[in-house]
């Protein structure tokens, strides 16, 4: 893995989301299917904006007594939108709103085929009234505060739904991670499935694997931890060390990601096929960011590889039997690379695009940075033409290491929100009139201390 710095693309401000909050905003979460986002604010509210015209659709309030720090949309919900919110008041709220189109799939289909007037006037793409006055008040009332999840002893820092939408993970300053199951019984009942307390400090972030029920967490204790269920009991399967400061955020690579190439590669190209084969063995990678001003990427060792390397004894290799979890459930993660140094202060959020494979980072220096992974010219042909026996350390020759890649900084924006720190960044599908029809064009959304939320386009 090689790192390089070469800004070759341009980030341009498309629009602010208006009107902004008058207080600090923490995080913006794109809806999984509709062209809307939810923004968490220190004014105890969540604001829902349209990505078609960048206007405020509704304000969710009344559920929390302190700042709303985090939120996440539940996936795979038909006919309504479900939003989880986490607050400094130590509680988690579940909010529900019936979708005006009746079915999410129909709403998206109408969005894709709407004419330009539908993007600006009336009900908007999400079927939510964009008007002011009484209609806005009526819309706010349509958000139902369904249930309050109480259990944490201190500020809730992050919430995340599992890929199936049946599990909700929450984490807190109290050093704990809670997993709740949505019983989906029509009565808004949630059951506590697990409480994990292995972290030695404030837990800043939780993020679910894109396809598996595997949870990653990041903490003030400088570690990343991985959690899985084994025999109906949730527990830690890996503790990743490497950062020299608080780990603020973790995010997963998309399950189908393939690095960029000097020329476009078809899906059946041998290089693409080889990458996907090796990728399938280790699964999606993790990206993390920290107070130490680095962005790091981690890869799980395939089980066959770490069994070849370690061959542990039944007692766990040290002669001391494990009383916490069986050895067979442990995972081994390697630091694959540190991305090019691009920040001067703490990095608060990283976002790995599931569509393009690009990574974005933001932090205390007010800078937005975008990174791209590319196959190294010449390495693809070399990898395909050479016979690669298994190496002495057990690394298969057709691993991604044989197809060498490099990470480049392709775009930066300094002072993206003036003098203010940027708390969060995320990718979302572009939905405004300027989008290119028939493409999965994305926008980058940044959320900052000044209360503004900005939408950016990336010109490659």
UniProtKB/Swiss-Prot annotation:
Say yes or no: keyword ATP-binding present. no
Q: Name one GO cellular component term.
A: cytosolic [4Fe-4S] assembly targeting complex
Q: Where is the composition biased (Low complexity)?
A: 312-324
- Sorted alphabetically, which PROSITE patterns does this protein's record hold? WD_REPEATS_2 (PS50082), WD_REPEATS_REGION (PS50294)
Q: Which GO terms describe its biological process?
A: iron-sulfur cluster assembly
Q: Which InterPro entries match?
A: CIAO1/Cia1, G-protein_beta_WD-40_rep, WD40/YVTN_repeat-like_dom_sf, WD40_repeat_dom_sf, WD40_rpt
- Which positions are tagged coiled coil? none
Q: Where on the tree of life does the source sit, at the highest rank?
A: Eukaryota
Which keywords appear in this protein's UniProt record, sorted alphabetically?
Repeat, WD repeat
> What biological function has been recorded for the protein in this entry?
Essential component of the cytosolic iron-sulfur (Fe/S) protein assembly machinery. Required for the maturation of extramitochondrial Fe/S proteins.
Q: Which family does it belong to?
A: Belongs to the WD repeat CIA1 family.
Protein name per UniProt: Probable cytosolic iron-sulfur protein assembly protein 1
Organism annotation: Aspergillus fumigatus (strain ATCC MYA-4609 / CBS 101355 / FGSC A1100 / Af293) (Neosartorya fumigata)
Taxonomic lineage from the root: Eukaryota, Fungi, Dikarya, Ascomycota, Pezizomycotina
């Amino acid at each position: 893995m090689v790192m390089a710095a070469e800004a070759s693309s341009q980030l341009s401000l498309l629009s602010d989301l208006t009107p902004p909050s008058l207080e600090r905003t923490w995080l913006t979460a794109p809806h999984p299917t509709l062209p809307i986002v939810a923004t968490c604010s220190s004014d105890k509210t969540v604001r829902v904006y349209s990505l078609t015209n960048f206007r405020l659709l509704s304000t969710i309030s009344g559920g929390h007594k302190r700042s709303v720090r985090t939120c996440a949309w539940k996936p795979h919900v038909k006919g309504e939108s479900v939003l989880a919110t986490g607050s400094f008041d130590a509680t988690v709220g579940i909010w529900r709103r019936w979708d005006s189109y009746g079915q999410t799939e129909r709403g998206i289909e109408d969005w894709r085929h709407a004419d330009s007037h539908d993007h600006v006037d009336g009900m908007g793409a999400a079927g939510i009234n964009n008007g002011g006055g009484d209609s806005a008040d009526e819309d706010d009332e349509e958000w139902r505060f369904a249930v309050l999840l109480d259990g944490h002893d201190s500020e809730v820092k992050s919430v995340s739904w599992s890929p199936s939408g049946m599990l909700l993970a929450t984490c807190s300053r109290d050093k704990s991670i809670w997993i709740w199951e949505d019983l989906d019984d029509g009565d808004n009942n949630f059951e506590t499935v697990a409480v994990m307390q292995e972290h030695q400090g404030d837990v800043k972030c939780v993020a679910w694997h894109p396809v598996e029920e595997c949870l990653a967490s990041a903490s003030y204790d400088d570690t990343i931890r991985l959690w899985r269920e084994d025999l109906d009991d949730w527990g830690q399967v890996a503790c990743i060390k490497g950062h020299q400061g608080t780990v603020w955020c973790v995010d997963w690579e998309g399950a189908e990601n393939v690095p960029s190439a000097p020329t476009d590669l078809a899906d059946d190209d041998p290089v693409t096929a080889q990458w996907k084969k090796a990728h399938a063995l280790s699964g999606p990678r993790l990206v993390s960011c920290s107070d130490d001003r680095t962005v790091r990427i981690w890869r799980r060792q395939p089980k066959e590889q770490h069994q070849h390397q370690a061959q542990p004894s039944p007692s766990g290799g040290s002669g001391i039997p494990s009383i916490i979890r069986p050895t067979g459930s442990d995972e081994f993660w390697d630091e694959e690379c540190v991305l090019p140094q691009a920040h001067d202060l703490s990095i608060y959020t990283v976002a790995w695009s599931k569509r393009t494979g690009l990574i974005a980072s933001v932090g205390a220096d007010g800078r937005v940075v975008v990174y791209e992974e590319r196959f190294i010219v010449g390495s693809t042909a070399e990898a395909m033409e050479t016979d690669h026996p298994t190496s002495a350390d057990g690394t298969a020759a057709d691993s991604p290491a044989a197809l060498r890649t490099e990470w480049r900084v392709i775009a930066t924006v300094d002072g993206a929100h003036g003098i203010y720190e940027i708390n969060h960044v995320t990718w979302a599908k572009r939905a405004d009139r300027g989008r290119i029809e028939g493409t999965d064009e994305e926008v980058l959304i940044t959320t900052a201390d000044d209360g503004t939320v900005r939408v950016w386009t990336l010109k490659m």
